[in-house]
Regions:
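C-terminal beta-signal and adjacent terminal beta-strands/loops
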Residues: 17-20, 693-714, 741-809
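Extracytoplasmic beta-strand/coil segments of soluble accessory domains associated
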Residues: 24, 47-87
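A beta-strand signature from Gram-negative outer-membrane beta-barrel systems
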Residues: 53, 89-91, 95-140, 145-149
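Transmembrane beta-barrel wall of Gram-negative outer-membrane proteins
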Residues: 146-220, 252-275
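Acidic/polar loop-and-plug regions of large Gram-negative outer-membrane beta-barrel proteins
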Residues: 207-268, 290-357, 420-435
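Structural signature of Gram-negative outer-membrane beta-barrels, strongest in the C-terminal barrel
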Residues: 213, 365, 386-390, 395, ...
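Surface-exposed extracellular loop regions of Gram-negative outer-membrane beta-barrel proteins
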Residues: 218, 224-234, 431, 477-478, ...
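Gram-negative outer-membrane beta-barrel transporters
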Residues: 461-464, 577-580, 585, 597-705, ...
C-alpha cells in the first residue's frame, strides 16, 4: 500500500522536470542500434573469416570487436564511407552488393579511394568485378535479433550456347528472409526480407552493370537503461521498452524500413590512354520509429529516475521499490500497457493521455558521378565531377491512441507556460486541433542538401617510389522547408523555406609509397574542411527556420605512417596515426534544470585528437593452421574547452553562454583493442577460435554538465568533481568459436553445416553508454545537494549460438 501511495504522490514532486527522452525529440543514438542484418549476413556466409580475401579478414575482426563497442582508430562505424564506382551508397546497399557477388575492398586510413580524394574515415569500396556465384540455399537458426533466416543466391550466364564466355551477360540474384523473436533479450523480434538482382557484362571497349535491391525490415530495438535497473533485475539484457498487453509482450520501440535502391555504372575506353566512367545511385527510403509518449500524465517509462529506489530518501519507500524490482514484478519493471489503456478510457473528453507515435523519415538520395582516367607522360590522372542530391522529410504520425478517441495537436509545454500559454498550436495551417490515428502531428519539415564537387587524383612513380596527390573541391547548399506553421514561430519563422546555407568543403591529400624486397613504407597526409550534418545547422529543425550562429566547416588535419613486411608465412603491418579535428559543432535539446525550461544548446569550437599505433599480423603456421592478430593502442580525447550557447526553446531568448570543460575527456571510443585468432582448415573441415578485448573506454561525455554554469552551481568540491568526472567502463572481452564441415554429395552438390558460439565465457560487457544532460537537486538534512543524472548504458549479449545449413548445387 505504501508503494501505491508513493507512486500516486510522485506526479506532484517534479512534474515539469521530465527526462528529455521521456517527452519529446531525442537524439537517435547510433551506438544503441543492433545491426541485426550484418549478423544475418555473416551467418549466411558461414565461416567467411576463413576465406582467402584479406578484406574479409579485416572486416571479420572489425565486426567482432564492434560488438564490444570498438571503433577503429577512434572512428565510429557509422562514420565509415561506402562507395560503388565512386558514388556514395549506404552500408545496407554495400552489404547487398557483396551478397550479389560484387567485389569489395576494405580501405583503411586516409589514402585516396577509387579515384576520389581519400578521407580519414574507413571505406568499403565496390567495383564492377562480379564473382560467379554457385547456386546456394542457406538456412540459419540465430536466436539473436531474430530466430530463423533463409537465403538463396546464384548467378547465371545468359548465353544461347553451352559455352560460358567471359563477355556473356551475367545475372545474379539474392533473396533473404528472416523472422522470429530474439531468444536472449525480452521484447525483441525481427522480421524482414531482402531481394537483389544484378546484370552486368564486359565487352570489347565497354562495361555495363545494373543492380536493383529491395530491403524491408520491421524489428523492435532495445533501449539504453541505467546500471541501477540492470543490477536490481539481475538481467544484463534488461530492456525497458516493452511490457505486457492482455498477457502478450508488446514493444514500444519498433523500427521499420523500406528502401528500394538502384545502382549502375557504364565504362568505356575512349582510346589507348583514356577511360570514361559514368556511375549513379538512387535510393528512396521510408523509415519509421515508434515511441511511447504522453501528455498531462506521468512518465510511462519503467526505469524513469523517479521510479527507481535511488530517487527516494525515505527508507521504507526505497525498500518496497527495491523488492518489487528484485522480484522482477513486470508492473514496475516493464511498461504497463493495460494501465495506459485504462487511463485513456477514463479521460472525460476522450483525448489521449498516452499514445504511440511514429517518427517517420522519407528520404530520397540521388548520386551521379562522371570521371575520366588518363595516362599522360607516365602520370596516371583521374578527374571528374560528382553531384549529390539528398532530401529528407521528417514528420510524426499518430500510430496508436491506446483506446482514446483523439490526440490534441498542441505544445503542452507552451500551454503550461504563463508567458506563451495562448500560442500552443503546433500547426496553424490545420483546420482542427484533434489528430486521429494516421494523422500527421507535432512537426513536419524537410531538409534538403545539394552538393557538386570536382576532384582530381594524380599518381606517378619516381626513384622506385610511388606518389599520389589528390584535390577535391565542393559546394554544398542546405535549406529547411517547414510544412507546419507553429504558432509560437508563426509565418516564415517555421513555415516555408528557410534561408539557404552555402558551404565550400575541400580536401587535399598526399601519399608516398616505397617498396624494396619484402618491406614497404608509406606516409599519408590529409587536410580537409567538411560540412556539418544538415540538422546541425538549425537551432531546432523540427519547428524553427532559425539557423545556428555562424555555420562553418569543421576541419581535420591527419597523418599516417606505415610499415609492412610480407614473407611466405608471415605478414606484418604497423601504422602510426594522428588526426586533429577542429571547429566541430553539435546541437542539443534537453530540459535545463537551472533555467527550469526546455532549451536548445548550440555547441561549437569542439576539438578532438586521435593518435596511436595499430599493429596487424597474419601467420601461416602450417598447411592447415593460420592465425591473425591486431592490436590498437591510442588516445582518443577532446582537446581544450567548447563553447555552449543555450537558448530558450519557446522564444529563442538567450539563456546562458558558458565554456564546457570537456578537454581531456575520452570521446567514448576505446583506446585499447586486441584481436587474436587461430584457424584450422583441412579437407572439408574449418574451425576458428578468436579472442577479443576492448579496454580503456568511457561513456560519451556531456558538454552540458561540464559547463561553468552547471558545475560551479554544485555546493561542494566533491559534487563538482562528480559533474566533471567521466565514468570509465570496465574492459570488455569475448571468446568466440566457429566450426564448419562440408559434405560433398556430387561434383557440384554439397551440404555445409556450421556452428558458431559467441562470447563463450558469457561475460557481461557494457558495449556503450552516455551521460545525460540533466542534474538533480536533493535536500538532505536541510542541505542542498547537486548530482548528475545516472548514465545510460547498453549491455551486450551474453553467450549466443548460431547454426547454419547451406546446400549448394
Amino acid at each position: 500500500m505504501a508503494l501505491v501511495v508513493l507512486l500516486a504522490l510522485a506526479p506532484h514532486i517534479v512534474v515539469a522536470q521530465e527526462d528529455v527522452e521521456d517527452y519529446r525529440y531525442y537524439k537517435f543514438y547510433k551506438e544503441e542500434q543492433e545491426n541485426v542484418l550484418e549478423l544475418l549476413a555473416l551467418s549466411a556466409d558461414s565461416l567467411s573469416a576463413l576465406g582467402n580475401n584479406i578484406s574479409r579478414h579485416i572486416i571479420n575482426w572489425d565486426y567482432q570487436l564492434r560488438t564490444l563497442g570498438y571503433a577503429s582508430r577512434g572512428v565510429a562505424k557509422y562514420e565509415s564511407v561506402y562507395t560503388f564506382e565512386n558514388v556514395a551508397i549506404t552500408s545496407r546497399t554495400s552489404r547487398l552488393l557483396s551478397r550479389l557477388g560484387i567485389s569489395e575492398e576494405y580501405v583503411m586510413g586516409i589514402c585516396g579511394v577509387d579515384g576520389s580524394v581519400g578521407g580519414l574515415k574507413h571505406h568499403i569500396v565496390h567495383s564492377h568485378a562480379p564473382r560467379r556465384l554457385k547456386p546456394e540455399i542457406s538456412a540459419s537458426l540465430l536466436g539473436r535479433g531474430s530466430l530463423l533466416s533463409l537465403s538463396h543466391r546464384a548467378s547465371h550466364s545468359l548465353t544461347k550456347s553451352d559455352v560460358v564466355l567471359d563477355d556473356d551477360w551475367q545475372l545474379s540474384q539474392y533473396i533473404n528472409l528472416y523472422t522470429g523473436p530474439d531468444l536472449y533479450v525480452d521484447g525483441l523480434f525481427s522480421n524482414g526480407a531482402e531481394v537483389g538482382v544484378s546484370l552486368g557484362r564486359r565487352f570489347k571497349n565497354n562495361s555495363l552493370f545494373l543492380s536493383a535491391m529491395l530491403p524491408w525490415s520491421r524489428r523492435s530495438v532495445r533501449q539504453a537503461t541505467t546500471e541501477e535497473a540492470v543490477m536490481l533485475t539481475q538481467n544484463y539484457g534488461y530492456n525497458p521498452a516493452w511490457g505486457l498487453q492482455s498477457g502478450k509482450a508488446r514493444s514500444s520501440r519498433i523500427n521499420s524500413t523500406l528502401a528500394p535502391t538502384l545502382v549502375g555504372s557504364w565504362q568505356r575506353r575512349l582510346g589507348m590512354w583514356t577511360t570514361m566512367r559514368l556511375s549513379a545511385a538512387m535510393e528512396v527510403e521510408r523509415r519509421g520509429r515508434t515511441a511511447l509518449s504522453w501528455c498531462d500524465a506521468m512518465s510511462a517509462v519503467p526505469d524513469n529516475y523517479r521510479y527507481l529506489p535511488s530517487y527516494y530518501t525515505d527508507d521504507d519507500a526505497s525498500r518496497e521499490l527495491t523488492e518489487a524490482w528484485r522480484y522482477n514484478d513486470v508492473r514496475y519493471t516493464q511498461i504497463a500497457w493495460d494501465e495506459l489503456y485504462h487511463t485513456n478510457l477514463i479521460q472525460s473528453d476522450g483525448h489521449a493521455a498516452y499514445f504511440v507515435e511514429n517518427r517517420r523519415t522519407n528520404s530520397q538520395h540521388y548520386a551521379l558521378n562522371l570521371d575520366f582516367t588518363t595516362l599522360f607522360r607516365g602520370v596516371d590522372i583521374e578527374y571528374g565531377l560528382r553531384a549529390v542530391l539528398r532530401s529528407d522529410r521528417y514528420f510524426k504520425v499518430v500510430e496508436d491512441l491506446l483506446g482514446a478517441r483523439h490526440l490534441l495537436d498542441i505544445d503542452y509545454f507552451v500551454r503550461d507556460d504563463a508567458t506563451y500559454a495562448t500560442k500552443y498550436r503546433n500547426n496553424l495551417q490545420a483546420t482542427k486541433l484533434e489528430a486521429s490515428e494516421g494523422d500527421h502531428f507535432g512537426y513536419d519539415y524537410r531538409l534538403s542538401q545539394f552538393a557538386v564537387s570536382g576532384y582530381g587524383v594524380a599518381r606517378w612513380q619516381k626513384w622506385d617510389m610511388d606518389f599520389e596527390l589528390g584535390v577535391d573541391l565542393s559546394t554544398t547548399t542546405i535549406n529547411r522547408r517547414g510544412y507546419f506553421e507553429k504558432e509560437l514561430f508563426a509565418a516564415n519563422r517555421s513555415f516555408g523555406r528557410s534561408r539557404a546555407v552555402m558551404l565550400f568543403p575541400a580536401r587535399l591529400n598526399f601519399a608516398w609509397y616505397y617498396n624494396f624486397g619484402r618491406h614497404a613504407f608509406d606516409a599519408q597526409l590529409l587536410i580537409s574542411g567538411s560540412s556539418p550534418e544538415a540538422e546541425l545547422l538549425f537551432l531546432q529543425p523540427q519547428y524553427n527556420n532559425r539557423l545556428t550562429d555562424s555555420p562553418t566547416l569543421s576541419r581535420c588535419y591527419a597523418m599516417e605512417v606505415g610499415y609492412s613486411f610480407v614473407s611466405q608465412r608471415l605478414s606484418l603491418d604497423a601504422t602510426l596515426y594522428l588526426s586533429h579535428y577542429t571547429n566541430e559543432c553539435d546541437v542539443l535539446y534537453y530540459y535545463d534544470d537551472l533555467a527550469d525550461e526546455y532549451v536548445d544548446a548550440q555547441v561549437s569550437d569542439i576539438k578532438r585528437l586521435n593518435c596511436g599505433v595499430e599493429l596487424r599480423a597474419k601467420a601461416q603456421w602450417s598447411q592447415y593452421l593460420s592465425s591473425k592478430a591486431m592490436i590498437n593502442l591510442g588516445r582518443h580525447r577532446y582537446v581544450g574547452s567548447a563553447m555552449v550557447v543555450t537558448y530558450a526553446d519557446n522564444d529563442n531568448d538567450l539563456v546562458a553562454i558558458s565554456r564546457s570543460a570537456i578537454g581531456g575527456c575520452n570521446t567514448a571510443q576505446p583506446e585499447l583493442a586486441l584481436y587474436a585468432d587461430i584457424a584450422y582448415r583441412r579437407m572439408e573441415w574449418q574451425a576458428l577460435v578468436s579472442f577479443n578485448y576492448v579496454g580503456l573506454r568511457s561513456v560519451a561525455p556531456s558538454f552540458v554538465s561540464r559547463t561553468e554554469r552547471i558545475y560551479t552551481y554544485a555546493p561542494s568540491p566533491e559534487e563538482q568533481d562528480a559533474l566533471l568526472q567521466q565514468q570509465r567502463l570496465p574492459a570488455a572481452t569475448s571468446l568466440n568459436i566457429s566450426l564448419s564441415k562440408r559434405f560433398q554429395l556430387a561434383d557440384d552438390t554439397y551440404i555445409r553445416l556450421s556452428l558458431s558460439l559467441d562470447n563463450l565465457l558469457g561475460t557481461h560487457n557494457i558495449t556503450s553508454g552516455y551521460e545525460q544532460h540533466r542534474i538533480s537537486e536533493v535536500l538532505i538534512a536541510q542541505r542542498k545537494h547537486v548530482r548528475p543524472f545516472a548514465n545510460k548504458v547498453m549491455f551486450g549479449y551474453g553467450r549466443t549460438c548460431r547454426v547454419n545449413v547451406s546446400f549448394g548445387f
